[in-house]
């Protein structure tokens, strides 16, 4: 193996390990390792084939980080592993493709100063992640900043820079560190410059962490002074995917969520008691409580949460046209609390085509309060990529057909008792 080929292989291995270990995975999650990925791509820009090397540097890691798509295809789409694994591999190749573009662009500016090169790297990374978020159907998974989500102090700059802007900031810091380290080990003449570059990168990351620590320290006080405390009851039904969409399980799923909601409200009554004044009295909940409480206890303290939250597609039927929609509305009326929940939404296009949306609904005791359609959908789970819209993959969509991406819509207001 030639020196050039060995170097490309080493960069590919380093980049892929950085992507996999730097993002949540079932093995080992080392958030800061993700910063080695843009550094590996910067080094790839100095090879004879920057695009190919940069692309290869991300494929295994991105495919491994998206392992859950293959698992879903195998477990719920009933694909043999021979067909399920390529779902993750193809998406990994697509994500890594943008890394190849980054290396190719950085190869064009290899002769500028390291400071300018790092600044360019940050801007290019920002633009590439932003473009990947909307290009085609948009695929915004595995962003650089998302790798740090496990450390709250390090993600607070998102409040100022946004996800893609912070990714660009991190990429610039990683490239500065790479420039510095290559000089530190490159000979005595360049060590001073390398120390300054690496120190600047460390200063950038320290500033981000310091801002995060400061923000986490002051925000509780600011929220207490300026905001309104809101209490939630969150319910996760954990309904098995292989039965979730079966028509015969729809009522069972609805009643399961109703029971869990009542259990959650009861469990929190003690903590919330006395915190609110205007609340439905226990007598108002008696009809529903008498139906679903196994022990027949229809008493609840006046203190209840402000909002009930159920997850994405919690209800396995089209709302509001589904046969159980009336019972769901009755539940919310009797609880006297607003409910945010997910369910499929069905619309008709002007051409008469049926359009399916992954929709979040707000339902209040007074009636429907608005909805939001999910914009970034999961390939092979919520839709089939255009180039792979084959009949063989239809089982992955759980018999629903593909969801349509939503358009940007104004947020709806949740009515609070206070």
Language model: regions and residue ranges:
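Short, intrinsically disordered terminal tails adjacent to the first/last structured region
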Residues: 1-2, 286
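Soluble catalytic domains of enzymes that build or remodel membrane lipids, polysaccharides, and related
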Residues: 214-418
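Membrane-embedded alpha-helical bundles of multi-pass enzymes
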Residues: 2-220, 246-247, 255, 274
């Amino acid at each position: 193996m030639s020196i050039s080929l060995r170097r490309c292989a080493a960069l590919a291995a380093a980049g892929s390990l950085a992507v996999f270990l730097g993002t949540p995975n079932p093995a080992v999650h080392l958030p800061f390792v993700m910063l080695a990925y843009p550094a590996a791509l910067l080094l790839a820009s100095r090879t004879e084939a920057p695009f190919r090397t940069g692309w290869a540097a991300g494929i295994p890691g991105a495919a491994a980080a998206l392992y859950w798509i293959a698992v879903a295809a195998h477990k719920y789409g009933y694909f043999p592993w021979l067909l399920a694994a390529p779902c993750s591999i193809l998406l990994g190749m697509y994500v890594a493709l943008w890394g190849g573009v980054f290396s190719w662009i950085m190869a064009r500016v290899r002769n500028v100063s390291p400071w300018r090169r790092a600044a360019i790297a940050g801007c290019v990374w920002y633009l590439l992640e932003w473009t990947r978020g909307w290009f085609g159907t948009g695929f915004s998974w595995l962003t650089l900043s998302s790798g740090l989500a496990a450390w709250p102090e390090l993600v607070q700059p998102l409040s100022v820079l946004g996800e893609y802007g912070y990714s660009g900031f991190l990429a610039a810091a990683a490239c500065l560190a790479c420039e510095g380290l290559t000089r530190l080990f490159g000979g005595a003449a360049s060590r001073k410059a390398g120390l300054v570059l690496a120190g600047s990168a460390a200063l950038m990351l320290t500033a981000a962490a310091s801002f995060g620590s400061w923000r986490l320290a002051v925000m509780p006080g600011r929220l207490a002074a300026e905001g309104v405390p809101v209490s939630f009851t969150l319910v996760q039904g954990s309904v098995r995917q292989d039965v979730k969409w079966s028509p015969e399980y729809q009522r069972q799923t609805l009643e399961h969520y109703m029971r869990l909601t009542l259990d959650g409200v009861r469990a929190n009554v003690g903590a919330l008691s006395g915190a609110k004044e205007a609340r439905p009295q226990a007598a108002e909940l008696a009809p529903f409580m008498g139906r679903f409480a196994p022990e027949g206890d229809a008493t609840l303290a006046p203190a209840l949460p402000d909002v009930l939250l159920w997850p994405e597609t919690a209800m396995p039927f089209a709302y509001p046209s589904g046969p159980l929609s009336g019972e769901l509305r009755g539940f919310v009326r009797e609880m006297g609390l607003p409910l945010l929940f997910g369910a499929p939404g069905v619309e008709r296009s002007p051409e008469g085509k049926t359009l399916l949306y992954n929709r979040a609904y707000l339902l209040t005791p007074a009636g429907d309060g608005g909805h939001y359609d999910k914009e970034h959908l999961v390939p092979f789970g919520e839709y089939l990529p255009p180039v792979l819209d084959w009949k063989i993959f239809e089982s992955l969509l759980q018999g629903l057909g593909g969801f349509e991406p939503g358009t940007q819509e104004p947020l709806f207001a949740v009515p609070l008792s206070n």
